[in-house]
């Protein structure tokens, strides 16, 4: 009798965690490598689960794929690890079924690996496992539904063996993209999975609640592998705590929800499996139940903007935004005075960097809130991935929405090692691509875990563009990728060459997404030499450097020459781009205010010529 035939007549018990037990033995390295170096340890765990009552065990191959093994420098051992894993499981299984296990790759950082890379890695491991002839496949811990669907298509095409696919939830009842669990399971069932279910992250209580909203499907079986509990940290080690009796009672509840396979994930041990086997092992499955209707959480629609987005302005006419760095010291008067000068000059928005060059400054959110409150100015608030983890970024976005600061620029952020505190941690939980997606998901009223936020935000998302690279075409490809992620417009690094401006226009003119081209006035010869020699990718022409050097130490001459160079660049930029991004050096708002006036005068002259 095969696995699927067995499931027709009884509830089967899966095994529990492998990593938890190895970790408890003091092993804290690549667990899959133990298939080669310490096979007796893996066999001991398999046997313990079989003796506890498991009808199904899974091979120790969750991370035995190219992507995960390469993190340990073990990618050359992938074949032997998978081969040995199936042999060890077979030798331990007795009458239990052996499933070849393959784990998900994607987490929140969807851009860490492309879908093509994931599929190549999956396909290689799949062939290795199938060659060893397991009784079926277990694809588990898939947080990303797109990834789950794609790898399932590959597996279903290559084998007729039973396939179990378990997705994982950060929040009860929904996947991280907001897809209800019931819909997600139905979609993978339609792609050919024989058993669909959930594992990891959540304990029994939340999984029971989640399954109460899932019907008992006629064409596939249901599986559940809960964590034992939420983990706690004791003396630097993760510890899970759950009473075996609790798991015994939970197993009965899982059966009532229609589960045919009940096992355990992180934190579970043979004791948990024994408790569940005693409770429901071998019992007839439940075939009918009352499905709880998922409560629809009210998500209020965001208020419509009373002003057009910066992308909308730049798509139709001239738009000028000006960067003004928040102060490094606890003195706000000079900053506020500079902001007022720029408002008087008629800019569309003030852009506020997020601890630029990894240097601590007054919070740009505080600056944005104050200039809005005191000057009624619009702010484009930069958000870096460097300083905040996933929790902090979401809290940050919620705060911005609460303050009504709806214009944001999503950037990676300069690494901490270049700033005042080179030993500080650079977080980078997300890339700028992921951050753009996250902000757009907030606009749909969903957090990163898929949990409803109660309202939709109304963020307009800018993305960074660095044209100061050797291969401009590759930089443009990154722009296209950011557009796919949801970027509404771009803000560029400063440009110091008329020809470069022309090249940028030619390479980007096919894009419908507006670009604000960056222009930053030089303040001295020393400033010019610093930019030329120390800022990656930016090279000033000999002519520009000579002009700034010729100005000497005379501050008025330095200012005049710096403005003259900027005006020359603006003459070209304004012909090619509607959006102009002026970067204020050293809080010298007089420079960017004067350049703003210059742009406005040029536009007025052009308009007069057009009218006449």
Curated annotation (Swiss-Prot):
Co-factor requirement: FAD; Zn(2+)
Keywords tagged on the record: Amino-acid biosynthesis, FAD, Flavoprotein, Metal-binding, Methionine biosynthesis, Methyltransferase, NAD, NADP, Oxidoreductase, S-adenosyl-L-methionine, Transferase, Zinc
GO BP terms in the entry: methionine biosynthetic process; methylation; tetrahydrofolate interconversion
Residues binding Zn(2+), per UniProt: 200, 265-266
A single GO molecular function term of this UniProt record: S-methylmethionine-homocysteine S-methyltransferase activity
Associated pathway: One-carbon metabolism; tetrahydrofolate interconversion
Annotated region (5,10-methylenetetrahydrofolate reductase), positions in chain: 295-612
EC number per UniProt: 2.1.1.10, 1.5.1.20
Recorded superkingdom: Bacteria
Keyword Metal-binding belongs to the record: yes
Recorded catalytic activity of this chain's protein: S-methyl-L-methionine + L-homocysteine = 2 L-methionine + H(+); (6S)-5-methyl-5,6,7,8-tetrahydrofolate + NADP(+) = (6R)-5,10-methylene-5,6,7,8-tetrahydrofolate + NADPH + H(+); (6S)-5-methyl-5,6,7,8-tetrahydrofolate + NAD(+) = (6R)-5,10-methylene-5,6,7,8-tetrahydrofolate + NADH + H(+)
Induction: Induced by methionine starvation.
GO cellular component: cytosol
Domain Hcy-binding: residue ranges: 1-280
Region described as Homocysteine S-methyltransferase: 1-280
Family according to the record: In the C-terminal section; belongs to the methylenetetrahydrofolate reductase family.
Name the record gives this protein: Bifunctional homocysteine S-methyltransferase/5,10-methylenetetrahydrofolate reductase
UniProt lineage: Bacteria, Bacillati, Bacillota, Bacilli, Bacillales
Gene name tied to this protein: yitJ
């Amino acid at each position: 009798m095969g696995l699927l035939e067995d499931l027709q007549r009884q509830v089967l018990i899966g095994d529990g965690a492998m990593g938890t037990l190895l970790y408890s033995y003091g092993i804290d390295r690549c667990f899959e490598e133990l298939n080669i170096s310490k096979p007796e340890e893996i066999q001991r765990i398999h046997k313990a689960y079989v003796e506890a009552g498991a009808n199904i065990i899974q091979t120790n191959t969750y991370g035995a794929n190219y992507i995960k093994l390469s993190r340990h420098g073990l990618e050359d051992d992938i074949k032997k690890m998978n081969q040995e894993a199936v042999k060890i499981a077979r030798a331990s299984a007795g009458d239990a079924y052996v499933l070849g296990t393959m784990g998900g790759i994607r987490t929140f950082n969807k851009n860490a690996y492309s879908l093509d890379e994931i599929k190549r890695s999956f396909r290689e491991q799949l062939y290795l496992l199938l060659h060893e002839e397991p009784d079926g496949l277990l694809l588990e811990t898939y947080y990303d539904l797109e990834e789950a669907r794609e790898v399932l298509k590959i597996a279903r095409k290559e084998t007729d063996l039973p396939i179990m696919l378990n997705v994982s939830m950060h929040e009860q009842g929904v996947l991280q993209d907001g897809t209800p669990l019931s819909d997600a399971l139905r979609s993978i069932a339609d792609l050919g999975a024989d058993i669909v279910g959930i594992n990891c992250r959540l304990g029994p209580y939340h999984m029971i609640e989640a399954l109460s909203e899932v019907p008992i499907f006629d064409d596939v079986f249901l599986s559940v592998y809960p964590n034992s509990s939420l983990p706690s940290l004791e003396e630097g080690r993760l510890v899970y705590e759950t009473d075996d009796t609790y798991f015994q009672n939970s197993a009965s509840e899982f059966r009532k929800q229609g589960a045919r396979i009940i096992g355990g994930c992180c934190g579970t041990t043979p004791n948990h499996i024994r408790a569940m086997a005693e409770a429901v092992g071998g019992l007839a499955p439940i075939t009918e139940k009352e499905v709880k209707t998922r409560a629809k959480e009210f998500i209020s629609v965001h208020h419509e903007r009373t002003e057009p987005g910066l992308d909308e302005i730049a798509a139709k006419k001239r738009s000028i935004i000006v960067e003004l760095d928040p102060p490094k010291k606890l003195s706000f008067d000079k900053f506020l005075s500079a902001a007022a000068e720029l408002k008087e000059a008629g800019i569309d928005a003030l852009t506020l960097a997020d601890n630029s060059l990894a240097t601590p400054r007054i919070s740009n959110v505080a600056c944005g809130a104050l200039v809005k409150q005191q000057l009624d100015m619009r702010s484009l608030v930069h958000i870096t991935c460097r300083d905040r983890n996933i929790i902090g970024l979401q809290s940050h976005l919620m705060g911005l929405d609460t303050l009504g600061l709806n214009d944001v620029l999503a950037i990676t952020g300069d690494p901490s090692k270049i700033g005042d505190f080179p030993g500080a941690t650079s977080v980078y939980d997300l890339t700028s691509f992921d951050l753009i997606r996250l902000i757009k998901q907030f606009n749909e009223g969903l957090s990163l875990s898929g949990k409803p936020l109660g309202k939709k935000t109304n963020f307009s998302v800018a993305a960074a563009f660095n044209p100061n690279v050797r291969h401009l075409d590759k930089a443009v490809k990154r722009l296209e990728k950011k557009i796919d992620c949801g970027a509404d417009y771009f803000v560029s690094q400063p440009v110091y060459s008329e020809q470069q401006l022309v090249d940028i226009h030619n390479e980007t003119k096919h894009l419908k997404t507006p670009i604000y081209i960056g222009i930053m006035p030089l303040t001295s010869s020393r400033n010019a030499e610093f930019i030329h020699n120390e800022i990656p990718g930016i090279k000033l022409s000999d002519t520009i450097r000579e002009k700034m050097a010729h100005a000497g130490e005379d501050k008025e001459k330095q200012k005049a020459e710096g403005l003259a160079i900027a005006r020359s660049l603006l003459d070209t930029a304004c012909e090619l781009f509607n959006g102009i991004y002026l970067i204020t050096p050293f809080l010298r708002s007089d420079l960017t205010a004067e350049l703003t006036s210059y742009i406005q005068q040029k536009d007025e002259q052009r308009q007069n010529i057009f009218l006449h």
